[in-house]
Every structure is written in C-alpha cells, then in structure tokens.
Amino acid sequence: MAQLNGSNGTGLLYKPRQYQYEMFEASLKENIIVAMDTGTGKTQIALLRIAHQLEGGGPRKLTWFLTPTVALCLQQYEVIRSHLPAVRACTITGLDKVERWKSQYIWDELLKDKQVVVSTHAVLFEALTHGFVRISQLGLLIFDEAHHCMRRHPANMIMLDFYHPTLRKHGRDSVPCILGLTASPVVRSKSQEMKTLESNLDSICKTPQVHKQELTTYAHRPELLPIICKAIDEGPGGRALQALEHAWDTADIDGDPDAIPQNGSLLNGSGEYKALMVRKTLCNEQIKRFVDRSRHIFAELGEWAADYYICTSVEQLRTTIRDQSLTMDWEDEERAYLSNFLSKLPVAEVQANLADPNNFTMSPKLAALINFLDKFDDPEFSGLIFVKQRVTVSVLARLLSLHPQTRDRFRCAAYVGMSVGSCRQDMVGDWHNAKKQRGTMDDFRSGRKNLIVTTSVLEEGIDVTACRVVVCFDKPANLKSFIQRRGRARQQKSTYAIMFSTADEHGDLRRWQILEQAMVEAYQDEERRLREAEAQEAVDENVPEMITVEATGAVITPDSVVTHLYHFCAVLPEERYVDNRPEFSFEKDRQGLIKGTVILPSCVHPKVRRIQGKLWWKSERAAVKETAFQAYRALYEFGLLNDHLLPLTKNPEMRPTDHTTLPSLLDVSEQYDPWTDWANSWSCPDVHQMRIALESNGHPADGLIMKLIGPTNLPPLAPITLFWDRDTRLTLSFDVPERITTVTDNCIANMRTVTALYIQAPRSRNLLNNDDFVTLFGPDLPSTELADWLLRNAGYETAHEAYSRGTMPGAMGIIRDLSRYDEPFFCHRWIESETGLIEIECRPIPRRRNFLHPPALDNGQADAIVESEHGSAKVHMVAAESCTVDKLPVSTAIFGLFIPHIVDRLESTLIANRLCATILCDVGFADIQHVITAIMAPSAQGVTNYQRYEFLGDSILKYIVSCQLFFQNLNWPEGFLTEGRTTIVQNPRLTRAALDAGLDSFIITKALTPRRWIAPLISTRVGAAPVKRQMSAKVLADVIEALIGAAYLDGGHSKAQICTHCFLPEVNRQPLDIPSLITQTEHGRTARHIIDGDLQRHLGYTFKNEDLLIEALTHPSCQHDQTTQSYQRLEFLGDAILDMVIVPIIFQYSNKISPGDMTLIKHAVVNANLLGFFCMEFSIEQDKTKVEKTPDGRFAVKSETQHVELWRFMRFNSLDLQTSRDAALDRHRRLRNKILTSLYHGPSYPWQSLSQLYADKFFSDIVESVLGAIYVDSGGDLSACERFLEQIGLLSYVRRVLLDGINVTHPRNIAQRLSKGDALFNLRRVSDEKGRSMYRCTVTMNDAQIVLVEGCQCGEEAEVRAANETIEFLQRRQEVV
C-alpha cells in the first residue's frame, strides 16, 4: 500500500491551461464528465478539483480517486504525491490483499487521517458493499476512464447500488460530487451510450468550448495508415510445434498427478473421475493452454518465434524445478510431470537452429510490421505496438530485440500491466513478471526504451510519453480502443497504423476507411469553425470606456489599456518559476457572445487579482479590451496606480521630492563648537563647578581632587578611563555640578592663572600667550584661598635650593633641565658624588599623551602617584646646577596631562546635549552617552564610535519602515513595498535627511591630539566666522542609523520610532498599533482547516488567523487559489523581522566584537543557503497508519512515526520548481551530515558545503514568510518570532557562533588577506559538454593562473571553492618559504 503522509497543505506544481480552468470551473457548478483527447491534461483538472475540495472548508470528507487498473492506480497516486506533496494520500489495491481485510477497525484506522484515497473500482465497491466505507463519507468521487461506468462494471455498481439510492433518499448533500475523465465517452459507437453514461454517473459530458482553439494546439491528430499483409497460411508449424502437438495428442493420462489415487481410489462417477476422463486436470489444462499459445505465436509471428517460445518456456520450467527441488509438495509433482512431458520435445536441436542468424522464418504479418518499422530512423523515436494476447507481447518484444533490421534501431520492452489476477500463474509458457516490468514505463518516459509492445492495458489511463508511431498489430476491438490508441500518437506529424490482412481488406478495412473519412470531415468542420472564429475576431467592435484623471490629464482608453495592463504586470518583481503576464479566459452564453475574465499574478491583492468583464461581446478581442479596462480601472481605484495612471513602483508615494544625486564627498557645516557659546557666556557668567576625583586601579589618589569651572550650567559627565601604562588604569570621576553663588573678577582671574599653571606644568615650553580660557580648572579649595595657593605652588626654585632643604623626591615638583630647553622630568632620587657634585636621577614624563587607549607596548614608565618601579624605564642623570624644580608637586602637576581629555569629553557632551535640545528634542534621551557614541565618527579616534550603533540602527530602521509600509499599504504587492522601503532607507535618502535636519554640524570628526592640543580661548571663539568641512555622504547616513540604534538602546522601539521620525517625516512618530490593524483586515475564505495542528505546535506558535499561515506557504507560482495572495508580502516583512531578532543578539553579546565582525556574523547567519538548510531540516512528526499481514495470516493496523518537512507544505504550480526542489533535496541528502558536523562541531562556517547545497530561494523564503505571518498574527510580538527561530535551530547556531568564536570570514576575504590583495578572481558562466550552464572560476596572481575550478552549479560555489584552493596554495608557499 502506497502512502503519502503530510500536512493538509496543498499546491499544484503545474500551471493549468485555460481550457483546463474552463473544465475545472464547470466541475464546480455541476457533476461533469470531462471528454478530452489523450495527452491534453485531464488529470490536471482532477488535481485542481482535489485541491479545491481540500481547501473548500466544510465537513471533512474523503476524496476517492477510482481507476480501472492497478498500474493506473499507482500512477495516479504518484501524480498526486508529486503535485500535492503535503496531502495525506494512500492507495488501496489487490496488491495489499484488501479482499482479506474483514475488520471495520482496519478500515477506520487506515482512513482516519487520510484525505485522498486512490483505488480500483472493485476495491471501493467491495468496501461499500460490506459497509466498511459509506457513500456519505466521500466528498468527491473521481472516475478515471469514466467510460467503464456501464452495465455490471464495478464502477457502475458503485453508482447503482450506493450513489443513486442515497441521492433519492437523502438528497444531493448526502452524496459526493462526481468528476469523470475520459477520452472516449462512447465505446461501441452507439448514440445512446453517451446518454447512458451521463445517467449512470449523474453527470453531464463536457468538452472545452470557449478555449477550444487553445485545446487544439495541444491535441495533435496523427496520420492514419493501413499496413496490408498477406493472409495467414495455417501450416503444420515448425519442428518444435509439431512435436508439442504430437506429444499432446498421444499423452498418457496415467502419469498425471491427478490420476494417482489419494486417500483411496477415485470413485467411478465422482467429479474427479469425470474430470480425469475429459482431460480437465490441472496439468492437462496447463499443457493445452501452452499448445494453444504456441499455435497462436506461430500464426501471428511465424515458425522462428513459435520455436523460440516453446524452447524458452521449457527451459524456464526446468529452472523453476531446480530452484524448488527441496520442497517437493503437490505443486512440485505437477511441475515434474510437465517437465517429463516436455522432455520429449527436441529442444536442443531446435535451439541450435534458432542460433542461426539467417534462420528468421517470419509470418507475413511480422514481416510487414518489420518493413513498416524499417522506415523510421529517428533518434528521438518512440512507439507503441498493441497486440491482442499477453503471450505475444513478450515474444514479439524479444524478437524485435534480436532481428537484424530492428535490434540496433529500437530499444524494446514488453508491458502487460501490474495485475496478476486471482489465479496462480501458469507453470509453463507464462512469461509475465510484474517485478521486471515495474520500471518499464519510467524507462520509456526517460528514453532508455523507445518501443513498447503491449496489450490494451496501455490504451487508457497510464501516463505514456507522446509517441511518434502507434501500431495496432490486431484491429481495435471497438471505437473506444480505436480512439484511445490514436490518442497515444500525439507527437506532431505522428503516425497511427492498423494492420489488415488481404483476407479482410474489402471488409474491415472499408469500415476503418469510413471511420477515418468521418474523422477527416470532423477535422475539416473544426477547421471551418476556427476560420469562422478568426473572421469574427476581425470584426471591429467599439468599446466605449475611458479613464480620465483631471489632476494630471492622464487618459486611458480600451485601445491602449491592454498594453498598459501588460506593463503593470511586467514591472512587478520577477520571480523564478513565475509568469507575470495577465491571463485571459472567456465564457460564452447561449447566443455565442463572449465575456472575458483576467487573472493577474498572485502577488497582486486578491481583491483586484481576478476581474471579470461586465459586457458580452461578439469577439474575444473586444472582450479582452473591455476586461483589461475593468482590471486597470480596478487597479487605479485600489491605489496601485498613480495619477499618471502608471504603476506606483515607478513613482512610489514616499519618493522624496529632491532627486538630486549627491556626491560621495560633501561640503558640510563645520563641527558645532560649544565653546563659542561659552565664550559669550563669560561676559555675564552663571558660574558652575564640579569636583573631579582621580582613582588609580580603583583606589583614590591622595591629593588629586580638582574642580572644573564654567560660565554656565555644566552637564553631567560620565567617568573617564585613562590608561597610564599597561598596568595602571586611572579613572576621572565627576560629581554633580553646582552653582557658585558669588564669584569676583579677582577670583576668576586667579582661576585662569591656576588653569594656565596646570596646563603648562607637564610641558617643556610656554605655549600660552593668553589665559582667557573658556574652561577653568582649580584645586578643591574655596575661591577665596586661591591667591595663597598660587603663592605656594606657582613658580620654581633651583635644584640646589630644594636639595639643601632636604626635599624628598616624592614631594618635589617637575624637574626641568635648562640645558635641554626646560624638558620636564620626574625626580627619582638625589645622588651626591665623592667630589660633592649633586645630580638627580630622573625619568621622563611619558611622551604618549593620549591616555584614552591602552598603550600598544609596555613603555615601563612609572609615576609618583602609583609609585611603580620598572627596571626597564629610561633613566636620565641631570646635574643639579642646570635644573630647576617647580613648586607645584608632581602629584598635582600631572593633572595638566588630563585636562585635554576632560575638555574633549565636555565638548562632546555639550554637542550631544545641543543635538538633543534641538533636532532630537522629541526623543527624550535619558543617557547622553548613547548620543555621544552615535555622533562620534571613527575619524575622531574616540573611545567609542558610531559603527556598532549603526550596525544596530540599520536593522531597526529597516524594521520600522518595513512594518509601516506593510500595515499601512495592505493593497501593495511586495514589489511596491520593496521599492518603497529602498527609497526611504537607502543612503542617499538618509544623507539628504541629515543635511535637511542640520545633523552635519553635530557629527564629531575632529580627533583629540593632546600633544598639539590648545585650550579653547574666549578671544579665538568670539566673532569667529563659520567655515565648511568635507565629509563622506555615507557618514551622514550612518550617523542617522546610529542615532536610531542609540534611541532603541535608550528607550526601546518607541524612542527609535520617534528618532526616525525626526529625520524621516514620512515615518510615523509613534509605532503602529498592530493588533488593531489586524482586527481591521478581512479574513479570507481560504482553507484554514487544512493547516496541520502538529505543524503549528512545532512552529512554536498557534495561529489565530490561519489564513496567514496558508499565505506564508503559498509560492508566487500558485495560480489555482485566487483568494490567497502569495507569500511575497510576508517574506518582505519577515526579512526585516529576521534582522530585528538576530542583530540585537549579536550586538548585546559583547562590545569586544568589532563592527566588521558583527557584520560578518550577521551575513553568515541570515545567509539564504543556511536558512534554506534549516528549512529542509525542519520537520514535524506524524503518525502513519498502514495495514500489515501478521505471521498467523491475519491483518493488523500498524502505526509508525514519519517526518514531514516544512517545504512539503508549500503550495505551488510549477514543474520547473519541482525539478529544482528535488535536485536541491538530493544535494541536501548528500551534504547533510557534512553541514551538520560543521555547524555544531566545526571551528568554521561551512561556506563551501552550503554553496554546494545551493538551496533555491523559496526554501529561505518560507522561513521568512512564516516569520512574517507569526509577527502579524501575534500583533507584533517579536518574542513569538524568536521562538520560531529557536525551533528551526537558527538561534542556537547564532549563540554557538558567538560563544565559540566560529570563524565566519568568507574564504575569498581570507584569500585576499593572505595574498595581500594580489589574488584576482575571474568568475565566468560557461556551458559543459551537455550544454548545461555551469560556472568556472580562475584565480591569478602576478599574471599567472594559480587556481582553476570548473563544473560548479552556481557562482558562489565556484568562487568559494576557488578561494579555498587559493588559501591552500598560499599556505603551502609560506611553509616552503
């Protein structure tokens, strides 16, 4: 029993033709029998109907697909399995021993979770007869080869005994819908047959009418040819046949096993005795059938064929006896009797003659066939030969494989179907082997076989490749056979041949000639109707419609609207496997007038996707115009066209008015200088101060508490960390600012003097020409005590004076060597020589003045504060007589080294505060440090810069804009949304927004250079003329994204939204109320009931509106469901949500990860191939029920668990997509273990394996679309989205990348780094020897090729493989060097 357990999701992988849609829609209105030629796609109509039945809602009922044969049953099941991969379907046939299923429990368990059952008619009839299945359980009953529903056939008995009685008793709702499929509704050419068939099936027989012209393009009628052969001359036959007939005539019945007495002698007059007397025993019946078959082979094929058949059959029997010699049961005795009987035949002598290649004695009929086949020498040949008896099939196929005229031209095979009947196989002469022929039809479809000899089993139903030649070795039995066989020859310019003997040439041939003439007349009549239709199309009908837009004067008329409608569809995003052209279909009324319907691509909103014309027309041309006009007007009224009547995608609503292209380098405002305001404030100061404390490695430094004084309110300052050396970390902490109530001018003057003293103390030269500092510093003393403090600490003394007072080195001031231009030193100790010369052992003040960053190398310098001793420090010996000693102690003097850092921090804080008070006044930042970071350009070389925040803000901006566009433009297709988002978030738009807002003046680009630092002065700031600076356009865009990231960190999505609005007014100020927007949207009528509960549980989310999940699983190629939009909109939203979930995780992990590495990690974990891999891996567990035979001969229901992957739920209509999907799944099976090992145990990201996987985009699209669906249904709950990403395994891998430091650098980047940029990659698309597109990548260095990679399926694979080989090459070369 074949089974397909999946979800309830459906999707057709074939895009139906218009005439198939016509028949499908007719089947929705009433029960019909679809009558179309073989090969025109009747099964596709059934698939459409099945999909509609599953998605139609209402009570859950079974769809039962009935076929006349087991082979056809298995074939149709495979069609359903491939076209509707997620449907739960199964087959029930005689191969399952269904006749022995005698328990209701077995049937109930098997069918409880099934949606589609495929079986033969007899299976369903017996199940209904015994009450295991009730007609009321069925929702749709499909009769393949519906012409069988006549007389006492099981197909008709289903209708007679169950359907019609239930219909009469309980009404139409109690019986299933009926869909019949046939190529020949009339079997015996009787006019009454069609009416009888319609009555039996309670259906109307229909063929396409409106789209008949399209149907004719797919129904190629063959040329009908007779093959005339001489009449069969019944002769005595060959040596083997004559010997066989003689042995049969003279056989001694006493040796027959049935003649041997068992349990006593046979009683005279018993049944066994009578059978024995008339030679009706088993063995004699076997021999008789063998003789009859041999005689038939001789008559049909000739002496050679009959001898070959007899000899081969005898050898097969002997082989069977040898293989079963150990089990001598009654059947073996029968075989032994037959073998002994046949041993009288001269097999060895006949076989010797058969080996002679010149001894092909053929019948006239076979000779005529071979001569006919000899005319065909086409490498693309495919043909069928229909014969009457099964025995002829195998022998003729073998003969054609051996004959000199055919053996090298045709690849022959035999096919007689899968059914073995209820009787056991004959022991002699029956060559049928169901297992050997199981792959025959696949071989024929693939071209491995090109000529099949068969019986009537291939007349109908079974999918057979369109043939070049069809030969009837025997005349068709009836009109049905004639039509069915003719339908197999449906290649263009095909041939349909019927063999006749000269004996009946004037009888039967005339009958077929008359029939052919009738067919020709029908063809001619059809051609006449087509010419009449073409003439009707030439009639110019006036379509009086017009669309006018007064605001622009735009006008569209019916004469131009078709072109415009095609243009609208053409500018929609191109999608692989999808044809975006509009599809027109038609219907006719009783007067023959036509009304049109147009269906737009599935990415268009369902409300305007299917538009019907309003009027009836004489010609299709006029109907197309009027229908296209109605569609275009609907698009305009729906908001998908602008006032110029053009698609919004070429002129989005939110496109900025200024389209000027900005250069990459811009002249922008100079960096905002807060000291200008402070300089002006000193004219009327409101003096404030704050205390500054110094700590060293977490411990307070004695005596180092200073004050910062300003002319206005001071902003709170964050602590400053300074790196004195590798082992010493200093921290400057700032107290809360406070106002100084009374400050005299004299005090301010003293403060300026103190500030000058601090700044000058650690420097060698007096760099100060003025002391009108904007910022002032002083000791932690009342302002009234500054004068005394200056007396004690200002100035200097000679080194001898300090030495004579016994001043200890640690309490001394800065030592200045007068012989070296007052170079400052730290005093380490006094040294007095034997001659009385006083020297000072000194150590230099650190030359490194920027203490914001740790030193690259340990310079080993010590200072008096930390009292560190380093033997490696550079020591200077200075004579005391050439030195002076500053009065200001070293412990206080070094504060002058920190003033540039304090002023720089104060400046950046004032700039950030000014930005928050102006442009960002509505945001309300709580932590100004976020703003400082966001506006700090990398060129400023600060402790932080905007790059990390920009990484975060980029995803937040994308998320905010995507959500707004998605929810505020529910009518927009994905292409409009994507272009709208790109217009808003692209760098040129952000750059223009930054300039318009004046953000350029707040971006900090000046680097702090303490060695050349000059304190800001009042005199240089007041009246300074504004200047310009140059800045990269990208920096302006980056800072906006960084500020959005800063706002998010400061106050979540609400502040990020406000911040975005400050720069982009088209973005809402407040986040959308998603729950209220969801409740406003209409729930569709799509198949919510088909969504599997197991799937939702495994997704980690249960949908309130299951339509969203169905939409998320609907590929753009899915055309059969016109009420559900494709997943593209949800995929657009999910793409942004994926970033919004992943990026914060990466950002928050550690600030030690560089922005560049964060970007590499993000790109690696959201890589489409990785998402596609997780999609292939993600599956749910479902129970599968099947019936198995137990050892005691009973039947039992067995349940087992199987995995159903997420991709199976995707709904689509594309054969190409299925082919690509299956190829990708094959690659997945081949690469799966390698990829899993790399993901969960390897040190590096599996770039090469994932590129070889080459997962089609729709695999990753499903992940993103489901993510979008969860977000919408949950009302914008990102945590629900996180749970889904956790379920598929993505978040656990992200954590592993972060925790284990997985190397995610792309191999090409590594190769470029190792080669120092000298490796040049050249990627080309080429064709292989079979004409398939492949990729080749070469790598050259210094004009020499070092790597060549070929035969890759995609450019990514070629490039990655080439990069890895380049890395190996460079590493080997380095080892040699």
Swiss-Prot record:
Family as reported in the entry's similarity comment: Belongs to the helicase family. Dicer subfamily.
Binding site for ATP: M36, D37, T38, G39, T40, G41, K42, T43
Coiled coil feature spans: none
Keywords for this protein: Antiviral defense, Antiviral protein, ATP-binding, Helicase, Hydrolase, Magnesium, Manganese, Metal-binding, Nucleotide-binding, Repeat, RNA-binding
Binding residue positions for Mg(2+): E1131, D1261, E1264
Broad enzyme group: hydrolase
Organism the protein comes from: Aspergillus oryzae (strain ATCC 42149 / RIB 40)
InterPro entries in the record: DEAD/DEAH_box_helicase_dom, Dicer_dimer_sf, Dicer_dimerisation_dom, Helicase_ATP-bd, Helicase_C-like, P-loop_NTPase, RNase_III_dom, RNase_III_sf
Superkingdom as given in the UniProt entry: Eukaryota
Cofactor(s) needed for function: Mg(2+); Mn(2+)
Function description: Dicer-like endonuclease involved in cleaving double-stranded RNA in the RNA interference (RNAi) pathway. Produces 21 to 25 bp dsRNAs (siRNAs) which target the selective destruction of homologous RNAs leading to sequence-specific suppression of gene expression, called post-transcriptional gene silencing (PTGS). Part of a broad host defense response against viral infection and transposons.
Domain Helicase ATP-binding: 23-203
Any one Gene Ontology molecular-function term assigned to this protein's record: metal ion binding
Site (Important for activity): K1257
Locus of motif DEAH box: 144-147
Family annotation (Gene3D superfamilies): Dicer dimerisation domain, P-loop containing nucleotide triphosphate hydrolases, Ribonuclease III domain
Domain Dicer dsRNA-binding fold: 561-655
GO BP, one annotated term: regulation of defense response to virus
EC number: 3.1.26.-, 3.6.4.-
Protein name per its UniProtKB record: Dicer-like protein 2
